[in-house]
Amino acid sequence: ETGCSYVICGHSERRQILCESDEFVGKKVKIVLAYGMTPILCVGETLEERESGQMKTRLLEEMRAALSGLSPEELLRTVIAYEPVWAIVYSQNNRSVFIRGSRRTDTNFVWRFRNRREYFFFP
């Protein structure tokens, strides 16, 4: 036992460098939950996906692949972190206007009840 209670799944650098697919990330989320830990699922679009209007599609694809088959209880135990790949990989300024636009894209995103305040009031 490591004493770990949170595990990051789907970080963009692991997806890119280690070729982790959405399905593979989904398997990791399920394993983390099975061991009683809390997965932090990272989702985010590339600059090309953002500029071509594919942001919503990409985010939903990542979330569907990672969260499919989870029970309502498991969904509540999962944290979703929006991590725009373009802000990390391309050293673009991660302006709050982009973040606000992204999180308003689909109100069906899953977030932890305890994190609702941060979700709605992000600067």
Give each language-model segment a name.
Residues 1-110, 114-116, 122-123:
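Active-site loop-to-helix "anion-binding N-cap" substructures in soluble metabolic enzymes
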